[in-house]
């Protein structure tokens, strides 16, 4: 649960930064920023749902120590839900404002601008490129905008790919943390079981047999971690 909460905090920080940027440059913010915020909101909601499922399981069948921790986890869950609700409402408000400004800009666009493809809100985002292509002696002015659009699309594809890769890596890190936590639990259970068997008078030979079996399981566990790290390496190598 701690790993999920840390993951949710990272998503929360990302949302705070992106929404603040969208609010600051609402008129000229790129469309890709809205897509990034939408994707992070969906991922944040999914993380909260996973956290809630773990919380419900722990509260339903937890020990006394876990029950004492329930208030802390419940407060975290309530806080995360409130944050998601606030982010979602703020994003909808900014999107509505963006659409209204964009529509107003097109409404008051002069006929001459409409015929010559004058600057709209979208073209303002390409000011630097338009200035370059409109300089005297620049023979590629008729092809500047299509080339820029192609570069923008390619950059947007790379950004989405990097965002998906980061999400995969975060999920892998979360899975690795869960596996390490489960390994620690298994080690504690093994120690408790060995002490219990000795207390019950079970022979050392039987205990050694059990420990050998546990050791084999541990080797399998280490092999799985190794294969996981190799997989992450090849994913990074493939995408980058």
UniProtKB/Swiss-Prot annotation:
Indicate how the chain sits in the lipid bilayer.
Single-pass type IV membrane protein
Keyword Transmembrane found: yes
Spell out the InterPro entries in the cross-references: GOSR2/Membrin/Bos1, Sec20_C
- Vesicular topological domain: 240
A single Gene Ontology CC term: Golgi membrane
GO process terms (BP): endoplasmic reticulum to Golgi vesicle-mediated transport; intracellular protein transport; vesicle fusion with Golgi apparatus
- Where does the UniProt annotation locate this protein? Golgi apparatus membrane; Endoplasmic reticulum membrane
- Chain ranges on the Cytoplasmic side, renumbered to this chain: 1-218
Transmembrane ranges, per UniProt, are: 219-239
Q: Provide the alphabetized UniProt keywords.
A: Endoplasmic reticulum, ER-Golgi transport, Golgi apparatus, Membrane, Protein transport, Transmembrane, Transmembrane helix, Transport
Q: Mostly located where?
A: Golgi
Which cysteine pairs make disulfide bonds?
none
Q: Which domain of life is it from?
A: Eukaryota
Record has Metal-binding as a keyword: no
Q: Which Pfam families match?
A: Sec20
Q: Name one GO molecular function term.
A: SNARE binding
Annotated function: SNARE required for protein transport between the ER and the Golgi complex.
Similarity remark: Belongs to the BOS1 family.
Q: What is this protein called?
A: Protein transport protein BOS1
